[in-house]
Amino acid sequence: MNSAFQPISAVIICKNEVRSIRSVLRALKGHVDEIVVVDSGSTDGTLDVVRSEGLEPVFHAFEGYGKQKQFACSLATNLWVLSVDADEVISPELGQELQEFQGSSTITAYRITRRFRFLGRTFKHGHGASDLPIRLFRTDYCRFDDAEVHESVKVEGEIGLVDGEMLHESYVDLAQYLEKFNRYTSIAAEQIVNSGKSRSVVLTGLMIPFYFLKNYVVWGNILNGTHGFIWSVLSSFYPFVKVAKAWALRKQ
């Protein structure tokens, strides 16, 4: 371990995240040495909130999640970067760890436990209730890939795990869910078209009941009550909608 604490830059990309961005920023304050916010054209008051928290957002046209996050990392002035989504709130325990972070001579990236929250309820059961994304890393050994969606960090070196957690407040209401659902399925549809692969709209549509059973029963969301049921129903339509959008794009 190093003898001195390592300075950390938190980097956030956002667009129209007025519902959650303030709590994200306030949770970070006092625990990291720098906060970088990259916005791709918010129109809902997000920029006003960021500025009211004493930060100046940087505009960068959206090129996909991987490239956008890598651009944000390039603005960081510290070697260690904490990548935080605009709907992720770090816990006080994680904040304390970040303040006392000393780094490692061999570990270049750390995973952080992320708890999933949907419509005000933290899921405690089933697939997706929590995951371990790489969120803290050295920018000289790690970088985001160029994926348009479902981006990941490429790591050179060992990967560790920190004890603290972050809360993924993905969808505070159904309007926000549907907004993101529409955005993600549109990106996924473009990827399908660009890949040249053909998928049956009819077959994918007929699979919706099976996707629901997998989400609700096999993956254990039945244990998350009504919230788990709603999540399972909505998620079951994702494959069909992205394939249907790809079909529509090809017809244009």
Residue ranges and their predicted role:
Residues 19-22, 44-53, 93-94:
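Acidic helix N-cap motif at the loop->helix transition within catalytic regions
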Residues 27, 39-48, 85:
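A conserved acidic beta->alpha catalytic loop
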Residues 67-73, 79-84, 91-252:
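Catalytic-site signature of metal-activated, phosphate-bearing donor transferases
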Residues 26-35:
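Short, acidic, metal-binding catalytic loop of nucleotide-sugar glycosyltransferases
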